[in-house]
Amino acid sequence: MFIQTLARQSTSSMYAFSSPDDVIQEVNSLIHHIFFEQVNAVSKTNLSIEAIKYHLLSPGQQFRAKVCLDACMKLDVAYNDMLILAAAAELLHEASLIHDDVQDGDEIRRNQPAVWKKFGKNIAICAG
């Protein structure tokens, strides 16, 4: 519902921000809203959701989201659409990292136990 509302409001390609970091903050806010507010309202006891939240609380460099934002700006994509696309790119990459850790047996991700190490391989696979 939130994303549909955001997409409907997306009529302008005017970028009202002072730096790319401002937009990354908005992308992070969108991801936070999805997983920490919207999903919480639906499922408070799902271990896979808890594993996703755990992973997202230690963000990386967000390179893929930044590349997506850059491409969207070059293509004059509407601002809200740009946020949705960058959030999707970042979430897809984060999911791949969870699976990568399971596959490689890496126990640490971003200076904390990898999702599979904390929640188990089955939960990590579902979370990713």
Per-range role (PLM):
Residues V39-G128:
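Mg2+-dependent prenyl diphosphate-binding active-site environment of isoprenoid biosynthetic enzymes
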Residues F2-V39:
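N-terminal amphipathic/basic leader segments beginning at the initiator methionine
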